[in-house]
Amino acid sequence: CQVDHHFRCDGDPAGIQRRVTLSEEGMLFMGQIDSETQWVESFHALSGHTERLESNPADPASLSALLATGHDSFDFFTQSPEIGRTRYVGEDSLTGRTVVIDDVTLDETRYSLTAFSPAGVELWRAKGHEFISRDWRMFLSGKGVVTTPTDRFEKNDEPVEFIFPGEAGFLSPKPKHGCGALMSQAPELQEYSNDHI
């Protein structure tokens, strides 16, 4: 039960896209990606921490590489004033499957992602499938499993409906689908659903 608002700001550098994710209770996440879908900056509302991409990643995420070859790996650090550095290592691959959701054509991807502390201790890992829009140059959430040292949960954030400017419900802060269900995972685990943008 959430709604994602995707938008651009005139004052941002070329290629920057922004996203705000809202639940029934309010904002969950706010983030920026660049034209290659690198995580430029993320704000996690439930925990109150911000992350920014460190410069010169060992293996930058590249949507262009994924589209050209069907596979892309990544290995980068983020820096946070609240929680320090975090290393993210993973990969995306095209499954070859194309889906149409609410008249929007998307390519399905498969992903795996692990987050590590600066000392190399695993913090959490996630795997599952997502979607990409070639036209919009962005990832859209899908189904996955997140595992931490103490917990594990499945998530399903697949898109249900796309609402464009001029259509009823555009810019509404209220989610429309899947609401009212009991959320069993802890609040901090819910945020992992928003990390892989």
Indicate residue ranges for each PLM-predicted region.
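Extended soluble regions of mature proteins
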Residues: 104-191
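Extended beta-strand-rich segments in extracellular/periplasmic secretory proteins, especially
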Residues: 62-119
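N-terminal cleavable signal peptides for secretion/export
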Residues: 1-19, 64-66, 72-76, 81, ...
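Short, flexible beta-strand-to-coil junctions
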Residues: 21-27, 80-81, 135, 143-148
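A structural microfeature
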Residues: 1, 29-31, 107
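An acidic-aromatic
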Residues: 11-69
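Short, exposed beta-strand/loop patches in secreted or surface proteins that constitute
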Residues: 5-12, 20, 31-32, 91-93, ...
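Short, surface-exposed coil-to-beta transition loops
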Residues: 26-29, 86-93, 122-129
